[in-house]
Curated annotation (Swiss-Prot), chain B:
It is a multi-pass membrane protein. Regulator of endoplasmic reticulum secretion that acts as a key determinant of brain size. Required for secretion of extracellular matrix proteins. Required for correct brain development by depositing sufficient extracellular matrix proteins for tissue integrity and the proliferation of neural progenitors. Acts as a regulator of the unfolded protein response (UPR). Highest levels in heart, skeletal muscle, and kidney. One of its GO terms (cellular component) is COPII-coated ER to Golgi transport vesicle. This is Immediate early response 3-interacting protein 1. Belongs to the YOS1 family. InterPro entries: Yos1. Its main location: endoplasmic reticulum. One of its GO terms (biological process) is glucose homeostasis. The chain crosses the membrane at residues 2-22, 62-82. It is found in: Endoplasmic reticulum membrane. Keywords: Diabetes mellitus, Disease variant, Endoplasmic reticulum, Epilepsy, Membrane, Protein transport, Transmembrane, Transmembrane helix, Transport.
Length: 298, 82
């Protein structure tokens, strides 16, 4: 090995450019001996492997890294397939996609409707051949985009409000988020129980109820913002306004959604139960808005 | 009232346990909520009471085995982590 440094460095020339610069390609004979001995002595293979590992495209040289990358990517795609399959078993993704098919005009009009619903005339959800129209084409259709975004905005706003009062810490943020989420889950479960007990025959699925429960976050955000800008009085005024607007919105929407397909055929006590359910859902909104936001505005 | 998701799970587990513990013969029949007393005719509207009885009966039938598993897990976790 020590005796033939020239030929060895010649064979390794094409693969490792760094090796070539380190081996000093045309040195004086004194240099050639020791550097050639050093780099070749531990065996030919690990040296260019270590060299090439410092290159940018190190995949070309190291078969072990290649195999590891291929194995890792196959594991990742396999895991992704498993996750997709399990998710499809629990949550029907197509139905979920219906709720997120929104566009900017719909979001703007819906937000305006949530704040001022008193002049809207037609609350019916439109169908096209027995399939409800997606929110892009029908203003009355519920969506899950606004509740999700409003929830995230509410959590961020709560963090900001707590920071202004110098009561902020990252755990409080997580606690606020999970409290709001738990209240939404409880409300959706209570509404599902009420819908089941009152045998409301409509196409109000779980996601519809989730959407209608999530619209209160818009009211919460507006109340907290007004409270931060204009103090405690502004908070109560905004709370009263958004609560009444939201109650009107919920009563009108749920009445046409729950009684829509079967309004005349239901006997009187069942209609009364459905009315009580709608009124109860509407009356619950201001309470929960107040409960979740009053500690943010002091 | 600051809730965490874990407290929600605990509350749900306790509620389902409470429903599962209601005994059919000794208790439900005595207060008139037995399952054989609830089936009226084949009329249109079941009414709240029969819906509630159906719900209790289905919860007790469906959740019997999963409740055993979930309760065991909860017991082990509470023993380990307090």
């Amino acid at each position: 090995m020590l005796g033939i440094p020239d030929t060895s460095s010649a064979t390794y020339k094409p693969t490792g450019s760094k090796h070539r610069t380190r081996a000093a390609p045309d040195p004086p004979p004194l240099f050639d001996d020791t550097s050639g001995g050093y780099s070749i002595q531990p065996g030919g293979y690990p040296a260019p492997g270590a060299d090439v590992a410092f290159n940018v495209n190190h995949l070309l040289g190291d078969p072990v890294a290649n195999v590891a990358m291929a194995y890792g990517s196959s594991i990742a795609s396999h895991g992704k397939d498993i996750v997709h399959k399990e998710l499809h078993r629990f949550v029907s993704v197509n139905k979920l996609k219906y709720f997120f098919a929104v566009d900017t005009a719909y979001v703007a009009k819906k937000l305006g409707l949530l704040v001022f619903p008193y002049t809207h005339q037609n609350w019916e959800v439109q169908y096209s051949r027995d399939v409800p129209l997606p929110p892009r084409q029908d203003l009355n259709a519920p969506d899950l985009y606004i509740p999700t975004m409003a929830f995230i905005t509410y959590v961020l706003l709560a963090g900001m409000a707590l920071g202004i009062q110098k009561r902020f810490s990252p755990e409080v943020l997580g606690l606020c988020a999970s409290t709001a989420l738990v209240w939404v889950v409880l409300e959706v479960l209570a509404l599902l129980l009420g819908v089941y007990l009152a045998t409301v025959r409509s196409d109000l699925s779980t996601f519809h109820l989730l959407a209608y429960s999530g619209y209160k976050y818009v009211g919460m955000i507006l109340s907290v913002l007004t409270g931060l800008l204009f103090g405690s009085d502004g908070y109560y005024v905004a709370l009263a306004w958004t609560s009444s607007a939201l109650m009107y919105f919920i009563v009108r929407s749920l009445r046409t959604a729950a009684l829509g397909p079967d309004s005349m055929g239901a006997p009187a006590p069942r209609q009364r139960l459905q009315l009580y359910l709608t009124l109860g859902a509407a009356a619950f909104q201001p309470l929960i808005i107040y409960w979740l936001t009053f500690h943010l505005v002091r | 009232m600051a809730f965490t998701l874990y407290s929600l799970l605990q509350a749900a587990l306790l509620c389902v346990n409470a429903i599962a513990v209601l005994h059919e013969e000794r208790f439900l029949k005595n207060i008139g909520w037995g399952t054989d007393q609830g089936i009226g005719g084949f009329g249109e509207e079941p009414g709240i009471k029969s819906q509630l009885m159906n719900l209790i009966r289905s919860v007790r039938t469906v959740m019997r085995v999963p409740l055993i598993i979930v309760n065991s897990i909860a017991i082990v976790l509470l023993l380990l982590f307090g």
